[in-house]
Curated annotation (Swiss-Prot):
Residues annotated to bind Mg(2+): 485, 491
Originating gene: pnp
Family stated for the protein in its record: Belongs to the polyribonucleotide nucleotidyltransferase family.
Full protein name: Polyribonucleotide nucleotidyltransferase
UniProt cross-references to SMART domains, sorted A to Z: KH, S1
UniProt entry keywords in alphabetical sequence: Cytoplasm, Magnesium, Metal-binding, Nucleotidyltransferase, RNA-binding, Transferase
Name of one Pfam family that matches: KH_1
Compartments (UniProt record): Cytoplasm
Names of required cofactors: Mg(2+)
HAMAP family per the UniProt record, alphabetical: PNPase (MF_01595)
GO biological process annotation, one example: mRNA catabolic process
One Gene Ontology molecular-function label: magnesium ion binding
Amino acid sequence: MIHTLETTVAGRKMKVDFGKTGMLSNAAIFMSYGDTVVMINANASKEPREGIDFFPLSVEYEERLYSVGKIPGGFIKREGKPSDKSILHARSIDRPLRPLFPKGYRNDVQIVNTVLSVEQDNLPEILAINGSSLALCLSSIPFTTPVAAVSVGLVDGEFIINPTVAQRENTILDLTVCATKERVMMVEAGGQEIDEETMYSAIMFGFEECKNIVAFQEEAVAKFGKTKNEPVLYKADEEVEKEVKSFAFDMIKEAMYIMDKDERNAQLDKVKEKISEEFSEKYEDKVADIAEVIYKTQKEIVRNMLLNEDRRPDGRAFDEVRPISCEVGILPRTHGTGLFTRGLTQVMTVATLGALGDVQILDGIAEEESKRYMHHYNFPSYSVGEVRPLRGPGRREIGHGALAERALEPLIPSESEFPYTIRLVSEVLSSNGSTSQASVCGSTLALLDAGVPIKRPAAGIAMGLITSEDLEKEKVITDIQGIEDFFGDMDFKVAGTEKGITSIQFDTKIKGLSNSCVKDALEGAKKARLHILGKIKECIPEPRKELSKYAPRTEIICIDPEKIRDVIGAGGKVINKIIADTNVKIEIKEDGKIFVTSNNEPEGVKKAISIIEGLTKEVVQGEIYLGKVTKTTNFGAFVEILPGKEGLVHISKLDFARVEKVEDVVSVGDEILVKVTDIDNQGRINLSRKDAIAKKEEEKDK
């Protein structure tokens, strides 16, 4: 039986069809918003997975290019691995849903979002979050708290829910808010230096609209939701928990109160060895339970320390940032480098400048086709002192890279101001909390060192949260380190300039944040951000005046757009010859702007520009040109005065004396001065060597 329910969001129809597709899935829905359609399938394994200590939730976001009427590029002509954007959208779906599953739930759960049709006014990723929540709520999987999501824009001082393409072009804020009917669960934001008060208001504005979508989901569940399965929840054996905790609590507490991380970890290893010696034989089949008890005991001690004793593991005040150091220019051959260290977190970012032709080409369902500025993030095993195989970037690396990229994007100069492609690579050298925000700081240093004229320096900070079980008591923490992130309830990342916020990402391990917590986190992040910006400015107060001598050089010339075809030539013959002869890269824009770039060959740039100017320059009657003889006939000589532009010097115009034979005066290949005496209606150019000589003699006499 097919069930249908509709509502209206921001003046557009949102509709769900349940039972129409995916008959063998636990729950399968067709969710539409305008002409955007996403199919969501939710399934779970019948039994918990053994031998794991985490919840195995898998969220997939599958883009189909047919959804926008495109055929994939390349030879294979089908969708390949997920794009970076697909991975980011999958992470955005995962983060608000994961905390709402029952604690101890170990069944495999998979949510597959397939984008089937896209109307660019209605973002499929927002629809997918709502659809994933609704599919889970309608299923028999033990998920009972609906989550809703909206996009919020800010145009001309007005907040807009789910802005259209035209509105997104003018918005200074790109905000996604996910919430239950009671609390905010997740926020993603990019903005053009938005002040804290405005950002808070925008989040609350989105929160209110989320409540309406939650009500829609609740109505759907009441009308056609399945009966929920009774979950089998993992819990450590009570006897094991009692004995291990009794034996080890004081030892673990003593270790957890050691401020130095290395010393603390070393002491914990010793405690774990003692626990193993004491219980390995008695509970040889309960190793996982023992590990769970140790983890829960550590968590209890750290949370009590923060919440009730007003003490942090490293002794800092709750609003104190770890010691900071900044360096630039540490790699001699790169275009710009920044080394940012905050406590035991250290990131080195390297900036590379390229020609505009080095942009990243995007083949996705969005309208955006290329990226001129990009940021990549690497997190090797040595950054946490571990040994594991080095692989390509995972979802976490892609997510952190995009977060730092978004933080700096509003500050990057326009193409006309700075005609270069910019790539930043952040290498995490040491990790003890908030490497993504350290990447923002390292990237700022690298850009300034590279001479990129960014609007203002940016910095990032991660705020944390500890709450009581009943959520009544809470404490916000500035600049969380690894242990506070691991045992805490929130990771609230805020990046921006002294003027305002450019990026936010926060998610939580609990059932959402209170409004006061959101406000306190924003204010605390501002204070910390200004402190860090001061340290950055002490190191390098402004962009370097000159680019690195190893960076490419780009010159811009403007031509009449009607002349572009003359520069390109038939089949690209002309432009390819210029590139081959001068060893440069050339980018031509539709408005007639031409960008000429060369690596360490300034003469090549000058030569290429000279050729292009010659190709596009108009011949002026009465002007004198230095031309080259290309052909001789019995009636005169043809002379090329500009690239591709020839004129005729009649035999009578070659010299003052009578000329019997053209070759007596000029030969093919000779360079001679000629004057343009006439351009006829057909564009034919008449030249005179005699008049050019006379004019030069006249100028000499003066």
